[in-house]
Amino acid sequence: MSTTPNIGFISLGCPKNLVDSERILTELRTDGYNIIPSYENADLVIVNTCGFIDSAVQESLEAIGEALEENGKVIVTGCLGAKENQIREVHPKVLEITGPHSYEAVMKHVHKYVPRPERNIYTSLVPAQGVKLTPKHYAYLKISEGCDHRCTFCIIPSMRGDLDSRPIVQVLDEAKRLADSGVKELLIVSQDTSAYALDQSKENQNKTVFWNGAPIKNNLITLCEQLGSLGIWVRLHYVYPYPHVDDLIPLMAQGKILPYLDIPLQHASPKVLKAMKRPGAIDRTLERIKKWREICPKLTLRSTFIVGFPGETEEDFQMLLDFLEEAQLDRVGCFKFSPVEGAVATEMADQVPEDVKEERFHRFMQVQQRISAARLQQKVGKTLAVIIDEIDEEGIIGRSMADAPEIDGVVYVDNLSEQEVKVGQVISVSITNADEYDLWGTC
């Protein structure tokens, strides 16, 4: 009697990589493999790596090393897989290495070392939406792969290639399957969400296709309109500040997609932005933010910035602080510039000393924490829609429309009414308190 082969799986990195992991796991289950959470009984281990910054590379190499030590049969995929020589130098015993989104190659290698079972007992158990690594009530939906930008601090295009948008009908079909399976929130991800379909010819962008019996065009605005028809929360991430992003704001004001924009601005000094190869018209950005908020007063703006970029002077940094004060962003992440092997910025002159980076990082965070706290304080006394993530003996933990999972704050809810609630449910919460990150309230 043959036994079902076991595959161990390690997923590292960002939400885009998580989606790749879900795709591979779905194919493994469809082919009849059993997925297990341990090295000990695995016939083979797959490590889906990250290679964005040096610390991520180190984490990936350590994970590969642990898998080799504990199991011995390891296949590597993901972003770091694009640098096969670097992996082989450290771990020559790895069986096979593939780059990111190489699903077919991964499965081919799995079949080579662990033949698929003759009798597949799992096919009927694979859900229509595929295997998901997120809680049942939210899911990441990747709409494109790769990036056409060449930001000097980033090596993603060298690992994931140029922009490659998925067909709009394929994206919408997956979104509908997720919604039909009980997903209440879709998190739209890619390397550059606002570039969706721009890699296609004008003819293809304007070509009429049909979905749900209706004619649609192949572009981001149409995609968001159709996603908004599913009756669930739709949250946009990684939105590069193209001019047509302005056209998304009315959809948010109308309630078709969440009034939430994750738009990585990276800096505010024109000189630094030019060195980064990022858009540098910061005054125009402030004008757009003002206009967006006029159209959609409930808009939440999230952004990320880099301090200590090569050549950043105290004057440049002060421009960044001044921008924070004027823009009054709701949610902000800050990173100290980290040299990445292969990135143009790593070889630039005028590298900023680590102690200066650290000092600027703390000054940045002090300013933004004060701004964030003040903006959250404005929500005290209001009633917000909150999606429930957890329920325990201490109460409810959820998120408002302004909070993406894992990167933003949460809402702690005291269920004074003792109403029956469940994870994934959207409830009305009266906000009673706030700090610089989180909210507290009652229902």
Curated annotation (Swiss-Prot):
Residues 377-443 form the TRAM domain. [4Fe-4S] cluster 1 binds at C14, C50, C79. InterPro entries: Elp3/MiaA/NifB-like_rSAM, Methylthiotransferase, Methylthiotransferase_CS, Methylthiotransferase_N, Methylthiotransferase_N_sf, NA-bd_OB-fold, Ribosomal_uS12_MeSTrfase_RimO, rSAM. It comes from the Bacteria. Disulfide bonds: none annotated. GO terms for cellular component: cytosol. It catalyses: L-aspartate(89)-[ribosomal protein uS12]-hydrogen + (sulfur carrier)-SH + AH2 + 2 S-adenosyl-L-methionine = 3-methylsulfanyl-L-aspartate(89)-[ribosomal protein uS12]-hydrogen + (sulfur carrier)-H + 5'-deoxyadenosine + L-methionine + A + S-adenosyl-L-homocysteine + 2 H(+). [4Fe-4S] cluster 2 binds at C147, C151, C154. GO terms for biological process: tRNA modification. Residues 5-115 form the MTTase N-terminal domain. Binds 2 [4Fe-4S] clusters. One cluster is coordinated with 3 cysteines and an exchangeable S-adenosyl-L-methionine. Its cofactor is [4Fe-4S] cluster. Belongs to the methylthiotransferase family. RimO subfamily. This is Ribosomal protein uS12 methylthiotransferase RimO. The gene is rimO.
